[in-house]
């Protein structure tokens, strides 16, 4: 099955967020540079920009949402795991139109693709705990 345009947007956002965190470059410039190298036809560009701008703008709040569900400090997390969790928590907190199961699954898939050998297990554990304790699993979305 081909990855969806939105999944590709998440994967691209992850790579730009990773680069931003390491280099401290301007996020918009990093995104423009990154997209020059990609086939943009297969990416949900609007969602890509929403993720990188939304996450960098609200990064401290997103990090504070994550902290209670981590068994180590944010600084101790790998850059990839931290970026994946930021994407997932952004979706859980800001995008009520995306089912929580989709956000969890997408985080796991990103971890399998970009993370270390057991990253997907760690991401799954953190997101499962957060969804349960924050009550996202009880949220009803009316479209």
UniProtKB/Swiss-Prot annotation:
GO cellular component labels: cytosol
Keywords, ordered alphabetically: RNA-binding, Transcription, Transcription antitermination, Transcription regulation
GO molecular function term, any single one: RNA binding
Superkingdom in the source lineage: Bacteria
Keyword Transcription (UniProt): yes
GO biological process: DNA-templated transcription termination; transcription antitermination
SUPFAM superfamilies listed in its UniProt record: NusB-like
Similarity section: Belongs to the NusB family.
Function: Involved in transcription antitermination. Required for transcription of ribosomal RNA (rRNA) genes. Binds specifically to the boxA antiterminator sequence of the ribosomal RNA (rrn) operons.
Protein name: Transcription antitermination protein NusB
